[in-house]
Amino acid sequence: MRIVLVGPPGAGKGTQAAYLAQNLSIPHIATGDLFRANISQGTDLGKQARAYMDAGQLVPDEVTIGMAKDRMAQADAAGGFLLDGFPRNVGQAEALDVMLKDEGVKLDAVLDLEVPEDEVVKRIAGRRVCRNNSAHVFHLTYNPPKAEGVCDACGGELYQRDDDSEETVRTRLEVYHTQTEPIIDYYRAQGLVVTISALGKVADVTARAMEALKASDEG
């Protein structure tokens, strides 16, 4: 299957993408991984991306599209893929359609992970990270430390990252509504959108997604 995964920040896209890709035996292609790989390997696209990032500018669509095209041309993606973080706007979605058409294939589904805005804020703003080890992550509601403000693993101080503040989260949601939500309308017009609730346990959401994808494939 060829799938695009969409959803607001805090919807658990990365987690679900990993499980779904494994269950479907297709590669999980994440924008962040594409950028890191191209930059670390010193590709032409990586150098272009690095120059924009170092200048504090947004990387142009054509660079991101080029990276995605190169990745989808690799052998492991011949039978399908799961895109996470791409396309990010309608222009990228249109470019993806052209790419796939040139290869004589098309998308099978666009999986939309739906989470209420207040839940997104709660999920992200509740995170607390250890100052000694950023891999030690807690949550005030879902995974609270035994002692308030103290890391269970090493006793380090727990703090809220700037990116996790409610103000920042709401700004990110605004960007999502403005830039990424129109993609859902674009694909809905093609009859590709499959919407599921991303509330509940990770395994339950994965099962819900697999069932919805199977139904859309059969339909």
UniProtKB/Swiss-Prot annotation:
Entry binding sites for AMP: 31, 36, 57-59, 85-88, 92, 161, 172
Catalytic function, reaction form: AMP + ATP = 2 ADP
Annotated region described as NMP, given as residue ranges: 30-59
Region of interest (LID), residue spans: 126-164
EC number(s) recorded for this UniProt protein: 2.7.4.3
MF term (GO), any: ATP binding
GO biological process terms, semicolon-separated: AMP salvage
Highest taxon of the lineage: Bacteria
Subcellular location: Cytoplasm
A GO cellular component entry from the record: cytoplasm
EC top class named in words: transferase
Pathway membership, UniProt: Purine metabolism; AMP biosynthesis via salvage pathway; AMP from ADP: step 1/1
Main localisation: cytoplasm
Residues bound to ATP: 10-15, 127, 137-138, 200
Swiss-Prot/TrEMBL keywords: ATP-binding, Cytoplasm, Kinase, Nucleotide biosynthesis, Nucleotide-binding, Transferase
Domain notes: Consists of three domains, a large central CORE domain and two small peripheral domains, NMPbind and LID, which undergo movements during catalysis. The LID domain closes over the site of phosphoryl transfer upon ATP binding. Assembling and dissambling the active center during each catalytic cycle provides an effective means to prevent ATP hydrolysis.
Family under the similarity heading: Belongs to the adenylate kinase family.
Subunit details: Monomer.
Primary role: Catalyzes the reversible transfer of the terminal phosphate group between ATP and AMP. Plays an important role in cellular energy homeostasis and in adenine nucleotide metabolism.
UniProt-recorded name of the protein: Adenylate kinase
Species this chain originates from: Streptomyces griseus subsp. griseus (strain JCM 4626 / CBS 651.72 / NBRC 13350 / KCC S-0626 / ISP 5235)
Gene that encodes the chain: adk
